[in-house]
Amino acid sequence: MAPNIRKSHPLLKMINSSLIDLPAPSNISAWWNFGSLLAVCLTTQILTGLLLAMHYTADTSLAFSSVAYTCRNVQYGWLIRNLHANGASFFFICIFLHIGRGLYYGSYLYKETWNTGVILLLTLMATAFVGYVLPWGQMSFWGATVITNLFSAIPYIGQTLVEWAWGGFSVDNPTLTRFFALHFLLPFVIAGITIIHLTFLHESGSNNPLGISSDSDKIPFHPYYTLKDILGLTLMFIPLLTLALFSPNLLGDPENFTPANPLVTPPHIKPEWYFLFAYAILRSIPNKLGGVLALAASVLILLLIPFLHKSKQRTMTFRPLSQTLFWLLVANLLILTWIGSQPVEHPFIIIGQMASLSYFTILLILFPLIGTLENKMLNY
């Protein structure tokens, strides 16, 4: 029999074993589509970003006008920019749903896969943050100033660290230049970590909605899940294109249409929508260092999730109490997102503090407690 090049070629056999002949559980639902959607988001962002970088100038006196020039005079520049800006939003929607799926179905018990995923989330957040500074509008400048300033809360080395990050005594040209360098570099770092993420995943194989071993019933990834992924892809691209073509500035801040001015502070400094939940947690603590620690904890808490799993069952499929708690957490995150977009005044302050407290209570105390309770209920 003639050798199959797909299975014998050194490069093709790697692709084959991870995308074609990969044994996959027969019962994974649409919640398992988001991994491939994230890969597509990353590819789209790298391609549109590369095209934008060809027309961008990382200089404080030229950055704003170079972005405006791209939108006005470059062929389809407006489309490339709108896809890139809104593509970031869809990237975060997909990653939040992907993490939510992992939480619900106990995928975090694959510890290496989960931990590399958390590193990917942190890298993505860093990339989005430095990218938001590049158009050099008012919110770009003040967002950069406020968030980088948080490092000054670190005892002893804080102030030195901030000035080192800025490349001076305020956010200025050196800051913009290095942020552009980082924004160009980090997506490729994300791509590298993604390969590690997949390597760890393929060691164990995918989890499934029942949370039990699926070794007895596996199907090839291609054509079943390649086709399912293409369907998911189409369903994601339709709203992305709708947003980019009909309402491209819906999720942006109007302040960013004004060029950066260090002498005028915008009335409400707030990040893009996907950071609002963390921003609300940061603001809910009246102490600077405390706020920074809470901000870090809000994301890093994901690393503790595998150790807080007390249930005998892996997924929440047959655990109604944990399900209720899970959706309570989702609602809580939506409240935090809303609070992050509101001014710091009554009643938003107290709502934010309650929601922040609930967030940590649900994850650190209630999930393990309810898991243990459900184990007890199995005996009756």
UniProtKB/Swiss-Prot annotation:
An example molecular function term from Gene Ontology annotations: ubiquinol-cytochrome-c reductase activity
Keyword Mitochondrion listed: yes
InterPro entries named in the record: Cyt_b/b6_C, Cyt_b/b6_C_sf, Cyt_b/b6_N, Cytb/b6-like_sf, Cytochrome_b, Cytochrome_b_C_euk/bac, Cytochrome_b_N_euk/bac, Di-haem_cyt_TM
Record's keyword annotation contains Secreted: no
Designated name of the protein: Cytochrome b
Main location: mitochondrion
Subunit-level organization: The cytochrome bc1 complex contains 11 subunits: 3 respiratory subunits (MT-CYB, CYC1 and UQCRFS1), 2 core proteins (UQCRC1 and UQCRC2) and 6 low-molecular weight proteins (UQCRH/QCR6, UQCRB/QCR7, UQCRQ/QCR8, UQCR10/QCR9, UQCR11/QCR10 and a cleavage product of UQCRFS1). This cytochrome bc1 complex then forms a dimer.
Positions bound to heme b b562: 84, 183
Gene3D superfamilies assigned: Cytochrome Bc1 Complex, Chain C (1.20.810.10)
Membrane topology: Multi-pass membrane protein
Residues the record lists as binding heme b b566: 98, 197
GO cellular component: mitochondrial inner membrane; respiratory chain complex III
Bilayer-crossing regions: 34-54, 78-99, 114-134, 179-199, 227-247, 289-309, 321-341, 348-368
Protein role: Component of the ubiquinol-cytochrome c reductase complex (complex III or cytochrome b-c1 complex) that is part of the mitochondrial respiratory chain. The b-c1 complex mediates electron transfer from ubiquinol to cytochrome c. Contributes to the generation of a proton gradient across the mitochondrial membrane that is then used for ATP synthesis.
Family: Belongs to the cytochrome b family.
Other information: Heme 1 (or BL or b562) is low-potential and absorbs at about 562 nm, and heme 2 (or BH or b566) is high-potential and absorbs at about 566 nm.
